[in-house]
């Protein structure tokens, strides 16, 4: 029974990964084609293509890692492949979290109806900052990944040089890996998460105040401003659920609470990569440009199938 359940979740994880890779690849191809055609992208499209690239690579790396690890448990636990994977995994996760945060900020400054001078200044300046914020996120993610590798290196160096430096050093290295590194990762991941939460709270509060004002004045709730707020809020709420799920899964993964030998490993990996696989479809169907191309391709595929 347990073997059948594991096989089911492995298959489900594989299908989810293929869907995520296809959806993120679709976003990258559509926006990349527009970039090549016109030589420029809107701030929203810059964030979406960056997010699509990072998620595409993250999904690909995660899929290869999980199946390689399941096939080479002993070799992987003490080899260079573990370090190689974690370098890429940490970098892509940090970059993805940062891109998600900038996407939420852009939604907020575009849709929130806030008259504070600081917010109005940010609303005017933020779109021009987007390219530099994306580049800065990549550079900071790269630097933090190298620092994490440098801090974590003593834990693995006995495997790399194939000798131990004594029980005291080994115990100290184990303590670093089990206690200090998860705390450090929690602090690092909390920064983009805080930016995301502040943005979504501001937008939801703006929608609440706008709705109350319209009700108080007796106007229809179907006006364009309210509908724009509602669409953005629905997108961000779904985004928030998937974002929080990804954040919690990273925290649990950092504590090594669920290992490959655990019966819940594959269900947990499905939950870890759920946001990376599902949210691209939300972005596609909430974006007019991506949605129109998607339906055109679907109709084209249907025509070939019928023919």
Swiss-Prot record:
The record's Gene Ontology cellular component field reads: plasma membrane
- Asked if the keyword Glycoprotein belongs to this entry, the reply reads yes
Give the positions annotated as glycosylation sites.
167
Molecular-function annotations in GO = bitter taste receptor activity; G protein-coupled receptor activity
Gene transcribed to yield this protein:
TAS2R41
Q: Which organism is it from?
A: Pongo pygmaeus (Bornean orangutan)
| Record protein name field | Taste receptor type 2 member 41
**Function according to Swiss-Prot or TrEMBL:** Receptor that may play a role in the perception of bitterness and is gustducin-linked. May play a role in sensing the chemical composition of the gastrointestinal content. The activity of this receptor may stimulate alpha gustducin, mediate PLC-beta-2 activation and lead to the gating of TRPM5.
Q: Where is it predominantly found?
A: membrane
- Residues on the membrane's Extracellular side span 1-7, 62-88, 151-183, 256-264
UniProt keywords, alphabetically: G-protein coupled receptor, Glycoprotein, Membrane, Receptor, Sensory transduction, Taste, Transducer, Transmembrane, Transmembrane helix
Could you tell me where this protein is found in the cell?
Membrane
Q: Which family does it belong to?
A: Belongs to the G-protein coupled receptor T2R family.
Q: Where are the transmembrane segments?
A: 8-28, 41-61, 89-109, 130-150, 184-204, 235-255, 265-285
């Amino acid at each position: 029974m347990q073997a059948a359940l594991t096989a089911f979740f492995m298959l489900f994880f594989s299908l989810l990964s293929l869907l995520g890779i296809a959806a993120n690849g679709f976003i990258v191809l559509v926006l990349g084609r527009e970039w090549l055609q016109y030589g420029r992208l809107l701030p929203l499209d810059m964030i979406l293509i960056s997010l699509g690239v990072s998620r595409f690579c993250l999904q690909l790396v995660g899929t290869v890692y999980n199946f390689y690890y399941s096939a080479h448990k002993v070799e992987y636990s003490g080899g260079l492949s573990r370090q190689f994977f974690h370098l890429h995994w940490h970098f892509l996760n940090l970059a993805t979290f940062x891109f998600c945060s900038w996407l939420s900020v852009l939604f907020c400054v575009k849709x929130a109806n806030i008259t504070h001078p600081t917010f109005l200044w940010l609303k005017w300046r933020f779109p021009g900052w987007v390219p530099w914020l994306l580049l800065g996120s990549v550079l900071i993610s790269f630097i933090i990944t190298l620092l994490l590798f440098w801090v974590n290196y003593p834990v693995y160096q006995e495997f790399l040089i194939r000798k131990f430096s004594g029980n005291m050093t080994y115990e100290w290295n184990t303590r670093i890996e089990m206690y200090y590194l998860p705390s450090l990762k929690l602090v690092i991941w909390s920064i983009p998460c805080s930016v995301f939460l502040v943005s979504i709270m501001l937008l939801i509060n703006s929608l609440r105040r706008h709705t109350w004002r319209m009700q108080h004045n007796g106007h229809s709730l179907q006006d364009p401003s309210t509908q724009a707020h509602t669409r953005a809020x629905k997108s961000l709420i779904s985004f928030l659920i998937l974002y929080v799920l990804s954040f919690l899964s990273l925290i649990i993964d950092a504590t090594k609470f669920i290992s490959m030998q655990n019966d819940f490993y594959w269900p947990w990996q499905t939950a870890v990569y759920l946001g990376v696989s599902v949210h691209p479809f939300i972005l596609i169907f909430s974006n007019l440009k991506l949605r129109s191309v998607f339906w055109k391709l679907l109709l084209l595929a249907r025509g070939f199938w019928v023919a």
